[in-house]
Design a protein with these regions (language model features):
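Helix-loop-strand module that forms the ligand-binding subsite of alpha/beta enzymes
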Residues: 53, 57-133
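Glycine-rich phosphate/pyrophosphate-binding loop and the adjoining helix
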Residues: 137-204
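Short, glycine/serine-rich, charged loops/turns that create anion-binding
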Residues: 11-12, 42, 110-111
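Residue-level recognition of beta-strand->loop/alpha-helix junctions
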Residues: 8, 39, 137-139
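N-terminal beta-loop-helix "entrance" segment that forms/cooperates
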Residues: 37-56, 146-152
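N-terminal beta1-alpha1 ligand-phosphate binding loop
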Residues: 1-33
C-alpha cells in the first residue's frame, strides 16, 4: 500500500494550516491510503537553522520523506512566501528527494494575492527535486474557515469542494503512477523471459 507523508510547515499551535492539512488527508484515508503526519514545528529549531542533517530528529524526518511514495505539503503564506520553517526543511533535503513521488502543495493565508506563492514560490522549488508529478495546488483563505466552540468545523462549501477535488486528483495520480510501475515491471519481466527463451533455443 502506498504511503503518503503529510507535512505541516506551520510554526503555530494551534494551526489553521495543520487543520486544512488534516481535511485534505481525509479523502485519502477514506480510499484506504496510509497517511503519516510530520509537523515540522516539532523538529529542533537549532538543528533546522544550522542545517544539521545529522541531528537524529531531523535525519528521521528526512528519511520518512524519502521513504514515502507521495507527499502532501501544507504551508502558511507570510509576505507572499511559503513559511521559513518549510524552507529550512526543504533546504536540508537531497537534490532529488522527491524523485518518483507525487506531491500535493497546499497553502493558507489571509489574502487571495498570497495564492501566487504556490505557483511562483513553492512549485519551482518542488520541481527542482524531480517529482514524478505535482498535483494542482490549493490555496485556502482564512475567511473560508467555519468555526464553532470547539474549533474548526469545516470550510465553506466551495473551498471544501476544491480541497476534496485536489485530494482525489492527487490520489488518482498516485494510482496511475503505481499502475505505470506495475506495467513497466510486467514488460520487463516479459522481455527477460523472451531473452531467456531465445537463449535456450540457441543453446538447443
Amino acid at each position: 500500500m502506498p504511503t503518503i507523508l503529510a507535512v505541516s510547515g506551520s510554526p503555530s499551535l494551534p494551526s489553521f494550516t495543520h487543520e486544512v492539512l488534516a481535511l485534505a488527508c481525509a479523502p485519502l484515508t477514506a480510499r484506504g491510503l496510509r497517511v503519516d503526519t510530520l509537523a515540522l514545528r516539532e523538529l529542533p529549531a537549532q538543528a533546522l537553522l544550522a542545517a544539521d542533517g545529522g541531528d537524529p530528529a531531523v535525519a528521521d524526518a528526512v528519511a520518512r520523506l524519502e521513504a514515502a511514495d507521495a507527499v502532501v505539503l501544507a504551508t502558511p503564506v507570510y509576505k507572499a512566501a511559503y513559511s521559513g520553517l518549510l524552507k529550512t526543511f526543504l533546504d536540508l533535503l537531497p537534490q532529488h528527494a522527491l524523485a518518483g513521488k507525487v506531491v500535493l502543495p497546499l497553502a493558507t493565508g489571509g489574502s487571495m494575492a498570497h495564492a501566487l506563492a504556490l505557483d511562483y514560490g513553492l512549485r519551482p522549488v518542488l520541481m527542482s527535486m524531480a517529482p514524478a508529478a505535482v498535483a494542482n495546488a490549493v490555496f485556502v483563505h482564512a475567511e473560508s474557515a467555519l468555526r464553532g466552540p470547539e474549533g474548526l468545523r469545516g470550510l465553506e462549501p466551495d473551498t471544501r469542494t476544491r480541497l476534496d477535488q485536489a485530494a482525489e486528483g492527487f490520489a488518482d495520480l498516485l494510482d496511475a503512477l503505481a499502475l505505470h510501475a506495475l506495467l513497466n515491471e510486467a514488460v520487463t519481466d516479459d522481455l527477460v523471459t523472451a531473452e531467456r527463451l531465445a537463449g535456450l533455443r540457441q543453446a538447443a
